[in-house]
Amino acid sequence: MRRLLLLLLLFLPAAPAAALRAVSLMPSYTEIIFALGAGDDLVGVSSFCNYPPEAAKIEKTGDYLRPNIEKVYSLKPDVVFTGAWAGKSVVKQLSSLGVKVAALPEEKKAEDVLTTVRLIAAALGRKEAGAALSARLSAEFKSMPPAPKRPLKVYVEADDGGWTTGSESFLSDAVTRAGGRNVFGGEKRGYFQATWEEVLLLDPEAVILLSGSAREFEARPMAKDMAAVKAGRVITALDRDAFTRPGPRLPGEINRLRMLLYGAK
């Protein structure tokens, strides 16, 4: 009888691992978690986590820079995902409460999303799914055409007030991969405010406008003399979230930007 029981145990399916309770404080991490097939592990997300649509049904924990610590703690998470750059105080407060925090490094190149995918997958016990997603995204990056001999000079206006990007942000690299050259690529900074005078002096040949309308941009002082305006390359058609989040949708949006810059070639 004992031998029979042992044989039965050998052939019974293994009990599934207990699902983790995860909180994501970054929209890009939320997208990655869903892409890994781990959306059901999420018990809390930031108020900015709006993709995929299923994220809207998950408990909100506030701004990713200033999350509601009590709310996060009340969700009894096994792990909380946040950016190491987003605020040491958040990590410190949660850690002091005994909450495990995965503070992930900032993506400074577009392909850094592959590292983020692997780190999140490992923390969730989904290494195989992480390897598969990482391989798919890597293939998408590798399939991108080489840069043209003379890349267009591109100004990225990420937000009102002249907020733009220097070489320390993955957005600058995204522009390069799309075949452009960031006019502020020489700035060893991430995000900063450029003056309108600086933009005019650099005379970009294309503008990526992630906030506001082309009409408003073209109405600015002396904008009509800018090469981008003359060429009709004030681009507003990008999906802001897909382009500004280092997640699974980024390679597709980079390819879309290339088409908007150069047409279907």
Language-model segments: residues:
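Short helices/loops that flank or line small-molecule/ion binding pockets
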Residues: 69-76, 97, 193-203
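A short, structured surface patch at a secondary-structure boundary
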Residues: 20-85, 183
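Sec/Tat signal peptide C-region and signal peptidase I cleavage site
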Residues: 14-19
